């Protein structure tokens, strides 16, 4: 799958083997985080295209157009405001 980062103007390949947050860090793209488990909401970003899911609904409050990088499961190519 492909992850397009709008503000970085770059696209990364992604295979769900790690969290999206970990994958971004491995590619030297850093974003704020704290808990890494869906509790705090620090890693939320806007999703513009595509679909994600969660194994368990995160406790952090998110809007329908937001995802948590630390715990989302990418279901398709996505475009995020990052």
From Swiss-Prot:
Gene3D superfamilies membership: 3.10.20.30
InterPro entries in UniProt: 2Fe-2S_ferredoxin-like_sf (IPR036010), 2Fe-2S_ferredoxin-type (IPR001041), 2Fe2S_fd_BS (IPR006058), Beta-grasp_dom_sf (IPR012675)
Matches recorded under CDD domains: fer2 (cd00207)
Residue ranges occupied by any 2Fe-2S ferredoxin-type domain in the UniProt entry: 1-82
Stored PROSITE patterns: 2FE2S_FER_1, 2FE2S_FER_2
Free-text cofactor note: Binds 1 [2Fe-2S] cluster.
Alphabetic keyword roster: 2Fe-2S, Electron transport, Iron, Iron-sulfur, Metal-binding, Transport
GO molecular function, one term: 2 iron, 2 sulfur cluster binding
Name assigned to this protein: Uncharacterized ferredoxin-like protein HI_1309
Source species: Haemophilus influenzae (strain ATCC 51907 / DSM 11121 / KW20 / Rd)
